Amino acid sequence: MNELDSLVESARQRFAQSTSPADLENAKAQFLGKSGRVTELMKGMAQLCVAEKKTRGAAINLAKQAIEAALNARRQALADAQLQQQLTADALDVSLPGRQRGQGGLHPVSLTLERIEGLFGSMGFDVADGPEIETDWFNFTALNTPEDHPARSMHDTFYVEGGTAGAPNLLRTHTSPMQIRHAVQHVKAHRAALDAGQPMPEIRVIAPGRAYRIDSDATHSPMFHQCEGLWIGENVGFKDLKVIFTGFCRRFFESDDLVLRFRPSFFPFTEPSAEIDIRFQTGPLAGRWLEVAGSGQVHPNVVRNMGLDPEKYIGFAFGMGLDRLTMLRYGVSDLRLFFDGDIRFLSQFR
């Protein structure tokens, strides 16, 4: 083995002994650095003739290439070993049972809304929808609310930008505007039949959604959920209201012995008007009268604002708080619990 072969073999052995990238770089310097052994051999050719330089230089370059190849091979081996070590440290046991994803559920008020829509849907009622930012006309005027009614004041109603002095915009204070919008569209769709003296299909609709009033305590929230119902036809009376609402309450609370009481009251959009109370015969609320809704026969002015003749068309309306119904159904005493976002509370309703 000549000098150059011995040098290459020595470099290979030194590289093989390197156990880290830093140690390998030190070994590289011993052979390929500025003061390395290969560099020293190149410097030693200064005293050779031209022909000898050519032969000697070619041999040294071959040795240098062999050393560089050994260096790169060892460098790659160290990198592969480091990668394998990292993969081993980060390895996952795929045979372990996985973590189950948390199971979500509907909010209790949403459960109540679904139940109400299903019950009234089985009685032939459609479900209306409408904007939460309303005009003064749909929220108050169309519902026969006087200009000086306290509900119109800024102490009770959230007014918003975008309207005019004579027609301000506001956050709807109830879901009744959806009933008016639905009725107006219904009448427009059947205007030709009405003008021809033909009967119009009845308006039978519920209007569930969010409403807003300036109020906040254990039983009230500035934002609350409401569901109102409307039935307009040529021969719809208070007796129909009692039958429909009694049937709804008994099915909603799953209590056939539930008792309902209709108390005279006043609302500008109905005449006559009544508050509806319920009384359970059994359970923790047994024997107590609990107010659940307002109702009445639709006022002639409201029927007229729908585009109908109040001499021919009549009907009833009712409105109930979804939050209160949810509180009664699940035995919750503080309305604010529904909106605090506490998963410990909400998970009970899955």
UniProtKB/Swiss-Prot annotation:
| Residues the entry annotates as binding Mg(2+) | 271
Look up the domain of life of the source.
Bacteria
Alphabetical list of InterPro entries matching this protein: aa-tRNA-synth_II (IPR006195), aa-tRNA-synth_II/BPL/LPL (IPR045864), Phe-tRNA-synth_IIc_asu (IPR004529), Phe-tRNA_ligase_II_N (IPR004188), Phe_tRNA_ligase_alpha1_bac (IPR022911), Phenylalanyl-tRNA_Synthase (IPR002319), tRNA-bd_arm (IPR010978)
Co-factor note (free text): Binds 2 magnesium ions per tetramer.
Q: What class of enzyme is it?
A: ligase
Report the cofactors: Mg(2+)
Q: A biological process (GO) annotation for this entry?
A: phenylalanyl-tRNA aminoacylation
Q: Which SUPFAM superfamilies match?
A: Class II aaRS and biotin synthetases, tRNA-binding arm
Cellular component (GO) terms are: cytoplasm
Any one Pfam family here would be tRNA-synt_2d
**Reaction(s) catalysed (UniProt annotation):** tRNA(Phe) + L-phenylalanine + ATP = L-phenylalanyl-tRNA(Phe) + AMP + diphosphate + H(+)
| The enzyme's E.C. designation | 6.1.1.20
The record's GO molecular-function terms, alphabetically, read: ATP binding; magnesium ion binding; phenylalanine-tRNA ligase activity; tRNA binding
Sorted keywords for this record are: Aminoacyl-tRNA synthetase, ATP-binding, Cytoplasm, Ligase, Magnesium, Metal-binding, Nucleotide-binding, Protein biosynthesis
Q: How does it assemble?
A: Tetramer of two alpha and two beta subunits.
Q: Which family does it belong to?
A: Belongs to the class-II aminoacyl-tRNA synthetase family. Phe-tRNA synthetase alpha subunit type 1 subfamily.
* NCBIfam families the record matches: pheS
Q: What is this protein called?
A: Phenylalanine--tRNA ligase alpha subunit
Species annotation: Verminephrobacter eiseniae (strain EF01-2)
* Gene that specifies this protein: pheS
